[in-house]
Amino acid sequence: MNKIYSLKYSSLTGGLIAVSELSKKVKGKTGRKLMTASVALSVSLSALPAEASTVSAEIPYQTFRDFAENKGVFTPGATGIEIKDKNGNAVGTLDVPMIDFSSVSRRGSLTLLSQGYGVSAKHGGLGDVNNASFGYDKNNYTVVKNNKHSGLDFSLHRFSKLITEAAPADINISGQLSDSSQYTAFYRAGAGTQYIKERSGKQTHIPGTFLTGGTVGTPWYSGNNLISSSPGDTYNKSQGPLASYGQMGDSGSPLFAYNSLSEKWSLAGVTLHNNGVNGQKNNWLLLPEDYIKNIITADFDPIISFNKNSKEHMSWTYDAAKGVGRIQQDDQQFVMHGNLNGNLNAGKNLYFTGENGIIDLKDNVNQGAGYLQFADDYTVTTSNDSSWSGGGIIVNYGTTVKWGINGVSGDDLHKVGDGTLIINGTGKNEGGLKIGAGTVILEQKEKNNDSTAFSSINISGGNSRVKLSGDNQIIPDNVSWGFRGGYLDINGKNTEFSRLQAVDYGAAIINSSTDKSLLTLNLSPLKKDEIAVSVKALDMNAIFQGGHGTAGDLYKTTFYGPTQYYLLKKPKFGSVLMGSLKNTSEWQFAGTDLNQAVDMAKNNKLTSSAQASYLYHGKLLGNMDIVIPELTGNDILTLDGSVSISGDMSKQDGALIFQGHPVIHAGQTVSASQSDWENREFSLNNLNLNNADFSLSRNAFMNGNIRAVNQSTVIIG
């Protein structure tokens, strides 16, 4: 057996979504061993109306693209990154820890400075944006308010929801940015029209719209709240090994500064100007911190403080018609504001303090873009099934909030902050969850035999965790992992998936409990109950002339007497009168029983929708056994993430592949022939194969017993 699966590029993730490549055929006997498979502003000063940059023509252009998207070698936190020219010669080293550019929007012109706000320039329409995406293009967030500075080319944007995919940029600047002993590196990123520049000064346009980035030399203060540098002096070593000059169109894009004393990156400014296409100097606007503080502060209602010495709980009432509510404890009353006549920006943020606060929600609350932030432990309950929707919840580090409130259908609760949110409402929660940081523990209480904590769950950001505490808390197939993923801790519960929706290696299913879990991966491209089958009648035109239809559709006819059912195999069929129904290339006989015919139609749709291989890019970790039965459609499961479990993995029929993963480069279609692959490790107790083929492919390392029976095969390499 020597199977090769094609590599496919995903526009969603900007990289590889599948690859299986087996280069050598080695039959293996069962037994414990370590197995390895690897192959080896004057007239000359221009505001920037769109997005662009100029970079060196001597360095592979892919390097600048990878840099801006944290792809290739530019993973956040990486140090000692060697930069090479097109001939493979070292031209410099990035010594400081690589910045995390996730705070930069996919268009490059807006930077997240808190989970609910982003900054940019004002000119060229940047002060009037409607939305921005982070992580992947599909993670699109609506802007509800564009705050435009009256005296500066600066805008501050408020989002309708807390951003869960990205970590906001720090804006704390201490000391002088021009002090090269403190601020030892400056990086930028932007998107759009691009140029490469030769030493002669000749520039060549690179078509396409995409993020690029690079280094900038130590800036100087140039007055009018501006700092300046000359990254357009591309081959001057003072601009760093990846000099990147903001060209016409790079307005609003960020400049980051590395503080060697605090060992942190901070947002230094937003791009405003350059000195023309062939110029050298860029100007960045320093962030107007007082303006930012005042705008965000104005979006908060007064701080809510729980009096722990009172015998009374807080009572939260809300008048939806007026968009005004009250949170009251004894004679202490706090006024809050929510969505008013569809204006999400009318909703204010709420900040809660006071130890062990308890709130009883009395009315349904739509807080618009307003979010809740908890600095202390709180319990939020409802005695009358009231719901809450809004911008989301921030739970501060070291804080635990018990949340007994259900959401509303079609709306997601966005949770960020390093603290813990315990979901302990009652019955089926029609709302969804998006988590970007911290922990959410699910212990929803049962009502009407339903304890579904959320209708759907999306785990993103890389540092987030959803932990099951009660039974039947999730609909497994409605769990997905977004940008950089996070952890689903099944916590000793037995869980079955028919689909694994993970877009990158950050996704993880784990069991942290001492109670062993059984994880069943009964994967299917679709579920039968998701497939609708209608029965069409073959009319007289079809009888005499034939007709057109959709392959897979179910038809009925009494042409041969009692009702018979047929499945169409082609989009065009001939005359029934002339014997078309007997043509097995056009029709499949489905019998005379309607239920059996419908079931056959569903099975055919399941098979036809199956991909070449089921794929999981994430991790499987902890105290669990994993069972993979015979799968619907193409019974091949490729794991190119990693496995580290204390128990067994069992595969019935079909094929199982462990393999490494090609390094993802920004915007580049990967191939099996590329030289850079990431190693993956697979550690387990026993791999049990029953009439199944197992392949340990390139860049995969396995530690465990293999027990193969019933004509199973083992291939290494």
Regions found by a protein language model. Give the residues of each.
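Glycine- and acidic-residue-biased ligand/ion/polar-headgroup-sensing regions
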Residues: K311-W316, G419, I435-K445, G462-S464, ...
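Solvent-exposed adhesion/ligand-recognition segments of exported proteins
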Residues: I4-K27, G31, S44, P49, ...
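Tryptophan-rich substrate-binding surfaces of secreted polymer-degrading and adhesive proteins
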Residues: E530-L606
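Conserved H-D interstitial segment of serine endopeptidase catalytic domains
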Residues: G118-A121, L126-E165
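Chymotrypsin/trypsin-fold serine protease catalytic domain
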Residues: F154-Y245, G249
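Catalytic histidine site
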Residues: E82-Y136
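Extracellular, surface-exposed repeat architectures
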Residues: A346-G425, V466-I531, D593-I645, D676-N686, ...
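C-terminal subregion of chymotrypsin/trypsin-like serine protease catalytic domains
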Residues: S53-I83, R106-S114, G118, K122-G124, ...
